[in-house]
Amino acid sequence: MQGSVIEFLKPHLVNIEQISSTHAKVTLEPLERGFGHTLGNALRRILLSSMPGCAVAEVEIDGVLHEYSSKEGVQEDILEVLLNLKGLAVKVSGKNDVTLTLNKSGIGPVLAADITHDGDVEIINPNHVICHLTDKDASINMRIYVQRGRGYVPASARVHSQDEDRPIGRLLVDARFSPVDRIAYNVEAARVEQRTDLDKLIIDMETNGTIDPEEAIRRAATILAEQLDAFVDLRDVRQPEIKEEKPEFDPILLRPVDDLELTVRSANCLKAETIHYIGDLVQRTEVELLKTPNLGKKSLTEIKDVLASRGLSLGMRLENWPPASIAED
């Protein structure tokens, strides 16, 4: 009897009511009191903000330099055209970004079905209206750049990350990557045998058609479970101590002596003695350097002062010098 008091009930999927191909209601019960709101709110937030999908991110329209303009023969202004393009439901297989083209002329509506694309792309809502052409000689030509992402990313958040040489006329669009259009949940009372203090979770959601509602909930639950994995066993959360690999030699020792900016006379004397790197130089003693032809006390003093300004001195001993990278050269 004690076990039944402390053990949690394990919920199960009771019903999936498929209202349409993009609209479904999912019922989950029984849940311990309070868990309906706990799980419902978590799943709702993930479904709205963290689901991956594809969306229109940029658009180029022939004859249009900026979004605050209009195009002759097009009923809508450019801002409205961009707003309509945001409603395009695109499904892309195997790629992170694709370019679609749209070329239409003559009087009538311009639909998503008029977009040209390859076999990796599927337009879910082909009857979606993009704009209307009002003249028989009117035409519209555009390149639509679709990217894969997550959640909602406004155009303003991507401006700083774009190249400065962005072509004039390439318009940024607020990208709504999430395939979930609407999500709501309701918690009702549930009963199991004599217990009446239980919850029933009902999730009501609509998608843009690029993902099945049931699959969307399954993915959201997977994301939530993966995020909670770190808490499953707190004894294992300690990270192994990572020992930083210190370089065998101070990087300054691997630099050429030319970096010391010595006088031409001193530099030539060192090169004549095959002293090419600072690591070669610091291992020489004052006596050894004074034996170098044409290198006098003035040059020696200059070398000592330059080394001292870098925290080095003559007569140093370096184990395993030269390193393999220099020896190979």
From Swiss-Prot:
One of its GO terms (cellular component) is cytoplasm. InterPro entries: DNA-dir_RNA_pol_insert, DNA-dir_RNA_pol_RpoA/D/Rpb3, DNA-dir_RpoA, RBP11-like, RNAP_asu_C, RNApol_insert_sf. Its EC number is 2.7.7.6. Residues 249-329 are annotated as: Alpha C-terminal domain (alpha-CTD). It is an enzyme of class 2 (transferase). Keywords: DNA-directed RNA polymerase, Nucleotidyltransferase, Transcription, Transferase. GO terms for biological process: DNA-templated transcription. It catalyses: RNA(n) + a ribonucleoside 5'-triphosphate = RNA(n+1) + diphosphate. Residues 1-235 are annotated as: Alpha N-terminal domain (alpha-NTD). SUPFAM superfamilies: C-terminal domain of RNA polymerase alpha subunit, Insert subdomain of RNA polymerase alpha subunit, RBP11-like subunits of RNA polymerase. Coiled coil: none annotated. One of its GO terms (molecular function) is DNA binding. CDD domains: RNAP_alpha_NTD (cd06928). DNA-dependent RNA polymerase catalyzes the transcription of DNA into RNA using the four ribonucleoside triphosphates as substrates. NCBIfam families: PRK05182.1-2 (NF003513), PRK05182.2-5 (NF003519), rpoA (TIGR02027). Homodimer. The RNAP catalytic core consists of 2 alpha, 1 beta, 1 beta' and 1 omega subunit. When a sigma factor is associated with the core the holoenzyme is formed, which can initiate transcription. Belongs to the RNA polymerase alpha chain family. The N-terminal domain is essential for RNAP assembly and basal transcription, whereas the C-terminal domain is involved in interaction with transcriptional regulators and with upstream promoter elements. This is DNA-directed RNA polymerase subunit alpha. The gene is rpoA.
